[in-house]
Amino acid sequence: MAEVNPAEVSAILKQQLSGFESKASLDEVGTVLTVGDGIANVYGLANAQYGELVQFESGLEGIVLNLEEDNVGVVLLGPANEIKESSTVKRTQRIASINVGEGIVGRVVDTLGAPIDGKGAIEGETFEMPLERKAPGVIYRQPVTEPLQTGIKSIDAMVPVGRGQRELVIGDRQTGKTTVCIDTILNQKEFYDAGEPVYCIYVAIGQKASTVAAIAKTLEDKGALAYTTIVAANASDPAPMQVYAPFAGAAIGEYFRDTGRPALIVFDDLSKQAVAYREVSLLLRRPPGREAYPGDVFFLHSRLLERSAKVIDDDGIAKQMNDLPESLKDKVKGGGSLTALPIIETQAGDVSAYIPTNVISITDGQIFLTSDLFNSGVRPAIDVGISVSRVGGNAQIKSMKKVAGTLKLDQAQYRELEAFAKFGSDLDPTTMSVISKGKRNVEILKQGQNDPYPVENQIAIIYAGSKNLLRDVPVEKVKEFERDYLAYLDTKHRDTLDTLKAGKLTDEVIDTLTQTAKELSAKYKN
């Protein structure tokens, strides 16, 4: 029999006793009274705060959204199968948050930041970013002055978007809203390749899982997933997950913005978020307002979209920004931006409904897409007459501003005369000239899906259209002319395109563009 060594026994006992703490850990615990439809009423959490994360004994988490006299209303962030009446719930004493780091780029995550793409855990250092956060104050912002190139001719020319802007994309279903936003993400590859990436976040709210998978595949095939994160709350996910998905996307965007980098976020779409929020609010027995939406649905969207901003260039001031997360304070840099492209779906073109008017009033402009244009083959189907960018004009590059200055007015005039021309064929030469030029410009502004144009190519072809250099080219041959024209400039006059990209429109550049257009259009003369 082995001998017991008293010294060894006492050493083990001392080691165990040294780690003993007499302090008791106190958790504030409540009890589930009722549960159903993704909502639990909990008794006993007297000190719970609004928006706090609570944990059920099954491990499921929820967010406190209703504080009543004797109970709290908790929305569940997952299926309620394992939660029963009298289950225990404990406070976590922290606000709902998401862990963000460089490793989240190129991944598909859910509302809580958990990866759902089957590629394993998110690697590298992460920082805790709250889902709900106050927008930067006035002194931490600066005006929008840098362009965010979308690669879409009609947007970059007539409804320009700047870094830090909120530009609404609005239209009926199946008019190409998502395509406009995905093309904008694809166009940022040019900057990623140049070592100046614009980090993109695509938030899919209430969409089919197959649609999200198709978008992820498109981004991957085009090499755009290398700088993009997808946040997905699918149609099958609980309503609270759909409500908070845009906030999770905004938190990821703020990580890049606050570390001094440009980011772009697409909310696809906020109509579905509003519907999910209405569902949650009605289940919490909040009084319904217009169209049965709760009274604070405007605040839901305004507090989300106000988080998009161009942060001041001064690092010292940026470090003092209000509501900075503790985890990020040492990493803060000035000069970052978060640009938002929220999408709203209208019913039969009714832009005066409740949610569309709310979001129009919050954003810095809107891009209207119409079914009529889409069905007539004008794609992207942007109605330039009612689309506007309130702050993007200051961000447009100088060469584009000079070239496209009158384009919007010309096209509006063309649409008016085109409608008038339907009533009679006896038109004066001036009117015929405007209609002829307008038709060719419409062809120039057409663009294929997932085919963004570099800004210098846009300026070159729009210059030819706005100066009426295509008058000898038949309308059906305009796209063919465009291909030849841009290919010729790219091979023979690359320096001209580079000058345009730098924002300069010199006499020499104008001569080259004019001469090239005249030479190429001559072969189309009858």
UniProtKB/Swiss-Prot annotation:
Any one Gene Ontology molecular-function term assigned to this protein's record: proton-transporting ATP synthase activity, rotational mechanism
Entry keyword annotation includes Nucleotide-binding: yes
InterPro entries registered for this protein in UniProt: ATP_synth_asu-like_sf (IPR023366), ATP_synth_asu_C (IPR000793), ATP_synth_asu_C_sf (IPR038376), ATP_synth_F1_a_nt-bd_dom (IPR033732), ATP_synth_F1_asu (IPR005294), ATPase_a/bsu_AS (IPR020003), ATPase_F1/V1/A1_a/bsu_N (IPR004100), ATPase_F1/V1/A1_a/bsu_N_sf (IPR036121)
Site for Required for activity, residues: S387
GO cellular component: plasma membrane; proton-transporting ATP synthase complex
Keywords, sorted A to Z: ATP synthesis, ATP-binding, Cell membrane, CF(1), Hydrogen ion transport, Ion transport, Membrane, Nucleotide-binding, Translocase, Transport
Annotated residues for binding of ATP: G171, D172, R173, Q174, T175, G176, K177, T178
Pfam families, A to Z: ATP-synt_ab, ATP-synt_ab_C, ATP-synt_ab_N
Membrane-topology descriptor: Peripheral membrane protein
Subcellular location: Cell membrane
Reactions performed catalytically: ATP + H2O + 4 H(+)(in) = ADP + phosphate + 5 H(+)(out)
The enzyme's E.C. designation: 7.1.2.2
Keyword hit for Kinase: no
Oligomeric and partner information: F-type ATPases have 2 components, CF(1) - the catalytic core - and CF(0) - the membrane proton channel. CF(1) has five subunits: alpha(3), beta(3), gamma(1), delta(1), epsilon(1). CF(0) has three main subunits: a(1), b(2) and c(9-12). The alpha and beta chains form an alternating ring which encloses part of the gamma chain. CF(1) is attached to CF(0) by a central stalk formed by the gamma and epsilon chains, while a peripheral stalk is formed by the delta and b chains.
Family (UniProt): Belongs to the ATPase alpha/beta chains family.
Biological function: Produces ATP from ADP in the presence of a proton gradient across the membrane. The alpha chain is a regulatory subunit.
Protein name stated in the entry: ATP synthase subunit alpha
Originating species: Christiangramia forsetii (strain DSM 17595 / CGMCC 1.15422 / KT0803)
